[in-house]
Amino acid sequence: MKVAVLGAAGGIGQALALLLKLQLPAGTNLALYDIAPVTPGVAVDVSHIPTAVKVVGYAGEDPTPALEGANLVLISAGVARKPGMDRSDLFNINAGIVRNLIEKVATVCPTACVGIITNPVNTTVAIAAEVLKKAGVYDKRKLFGVTSLDVLRSETFVAELKGKDVNDVKVPVIGGHSGVTILPLLSQAFEEDKIDFTAEEVAALTKRIQNAGTEVVEAKAGGGSATLSMAQAAARFARSVLKGLTGEQVVEYAYVEGNGEYARFFAQPVRLGLNGVEELLPIGTLSAYEEEAVQAMIPTLKADIELGEKFVNG
């Protein structure tokens, strides 16, 4: 198996390279690519860590060598949020970066699974889909927006609030990957049993989870965005996809093109397998609060998606 990270010299990319070197199955090849000249050095640096994962780094304008033979491509290239910016402010820069990289994926490794980390994910995934479609190689089972950080944050915050063991807490998160489109289904949160919340706790937790990215941006005071936690979420996602590609049945949350019930792309539980998404899993019964929140987010989510489609198609 080969995993390629595009944007490997950035804040997320370097942390992700480290985690993948430590966590990928023995025998996996890891290719690191970035436009920055430091990238081969990042590869040399992590290659000194004693695990059976082979790492090679590539720099420059052309990601082709990194993409050749890739089974999974993770794209974290782009600019990070600064204080006062929201994820949509990133669109103007990151949209073009994602488009250009996906054009290369379409020619070099069209059957690879692709995980988009670059924000705004609600929009960049739509861009990727349209570029792949134009190239005649789009397989909706193999394109993902990596939203697993929303799940990790939800589980962490719930465990902290309720004094639970975070390893046992499970919280589904659906919708999208920014602001009001992030919806933790706290009515379905459980440890060994269902976890109960007051209405006030639900409102406060939901808001904190939705604004957790901003919490990090502000705490870093202009020095970056959520890179380390995002890298861990992406590494977990990568391991899940690879398990699926080797025949294991794995459930993960991701932003995928589904049945269009709410919007063309929607974050939900999926069963991963040999072809990427093998099955879209039901989101279960929503509370009245959650149902209202889903209906309220749909216009935002649809507008985000349309922005990406129009960027490619005019």
From Swiss-Prot:
Keywords: NAD, Oxidoreductase, Tricarboxylic acid cycle. Its EC number is 1.1.1.37. This is Malate dehydrogenase. Substrate binds at R81, R87, N119, R153. The keyword NAD applies. Catalyzes the reversible oxidation of malate to oxaloacetate. SUPFAM superfamilies: LDH C-terminal domain-like, NAD(P)-binding Rossmann-fold domains. GO terms for cellular component: cytoplasm. NAD(+) binds at G7, A8, A9, G10, G11, I12, G13, D34, N94, I117, T118, N119, M230. It catalyses: (S)-malate + NAD(+) = oxaloacetate + NADH + H(+).
